[in-house]
Amino acid sequence: MKKLTKYCFFILFSAIVIIFNLNFLDNSISGYKQYDELKRQIEICCTWGDTLEDGILTFEIINAKPESKELVKAAFSYWDQNLDALRFKEADDKEKVDISVSFGSDNGKVAGQTITNFDSKGFIYSNKIFLAENAFTKKLTNNLIEYIAKHEIGHVLGLGHANFDDSLMSSLVYNINNKIDQCDIEAVMQANKWKLIDNSVVPQLTKNKSYICK
């Protein structure tokens, strides 16, 4: 199946996949813009296609320590509990994997990364999530790992970044918010409206580029 790709690192470029990076950055560093003057909103990136027809997305977790694996499973479960028409399921050996999560240590500034693959119609086909065990030469706490996993799963569900600091979908790890709030949920619903709102069997790409929080 032919795949389309795009790259996203704060700015969206035309290419092969969309890559979202979650970075560590102190709020005092110059160049980090505050968004107080704008409406609070979350970018909408993309839409799942036929894969979501049954309302189930499968995942696998590889190269993870037992404790880290449980944190990622808890992150999937937390999203699962907040989305009525969608369920995450850990794939067995015979199932197609929609979302692959892997761990590594590069001691860089990227704490998490999501790579989204598209089919020829522009729908999400599969995702790969990379989670760092160390960043800035420091081991990440369990709280941070779970937060980053929840953030990356937000990208998996079609979200981009939020334009305000106290959001799970903020592009920077500044003020850790482990909570999935109503704005996150509504944005995911809009990204995948054909299934999660309309309950249709015919996938339709979202026309919304962002969701303004109410």
What are the residue ranges of the model-derived segments?
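Intrinsic-disorder/low-complexity, polar/charged segments
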Residues: 65, 91-93, 185
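Loop/turn elements at helix/coil->beta-strand transitions in domains of secreted/extracellular proteins
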Residues: 55-56, 84-86, 96-97, 165, ...
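N-terminal secretory signal peptides that target proteins for export/translocation
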Residues: 1-3
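Disordered inhibitory propeptide/activation segment of secreted metzincin zinc metalloprotease zymogens
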Residues: 5-68, 76, 113-121, 196-201, ...
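Metzincin-family zinc-dependent endopeptidase catalytic domain
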Residues: 69-156, 160
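Metalloprotease/metallohydrolase-associated module, dominated by Zn2+-dependent proteases
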Residues: 18-27, 119-121, 125-144, 160-214
